[in-house]
Amino acid sequence: GYVESGMCKMIAIGIAKHFGCSWFHRQGFDTFGERIPMVAAEFLKNMNVIMGVGVVQNAFDEISEIKAYPKDKIIEGDHELLQIAKRRLPRMKFDNIDVLIIDQIGKNISGEGADPNVTGRGCMPGFEDDFHCKKMFVRKLTPPSHGNACGLCYADVTTRQCLQSVDWESTWINFSTNMMLSAGKIPVYQNTDYEALRLAIRTC
């Protein structure tokens, strides 16, 4: 869409918290591109907002751009920062690989645990157009995710240790809010990293 996971999404979904998130997801992911800027524009028109500050990170998780926009330029600025963010996304060296090993996933990295623009796996079709892996192995969750396992469903293999670190209550709340119970699926798990990696390789 014109804007994605930036200032407009924070306004349209984030400020309304659980209610806003539930309402948006009930409309369907395919409506996000149209609805997010529309709802953000309505909010900005009716609320006392001074400005918006957008932050872009690079492929090394470092802040690479900070820009402030006046109220009437926030949506336009969000689109501008989206183009910058896309240019600075991390890229795989190969377009097609057998096994992708992800050390950690978490909500602090991406709403889907790992950025689907990088991994090629997400809730919407199209991410696999630029990168494809036959099997994905997720080792663990990030500490800041506090056990929220959102995104683990995209993995083919994980470990028992990873599943034992999951806070199932917060994870189920996340899935029920976004109306995607399929996102709660659990990948095949093994007792150790070695066994998980061996299984991923053997089943390519």
Task: Go through each PLM region and give its residues.
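Conserved, well-structured core segments that form the ligand-binding/active-site neighborhood
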Residues: 2-106, 129-131
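Hard-cation-handling environments
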Residues: 110
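C-terminal non-catalytic interaction/assembly regions of soluble proteins
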Residues: 117-121, 125-204
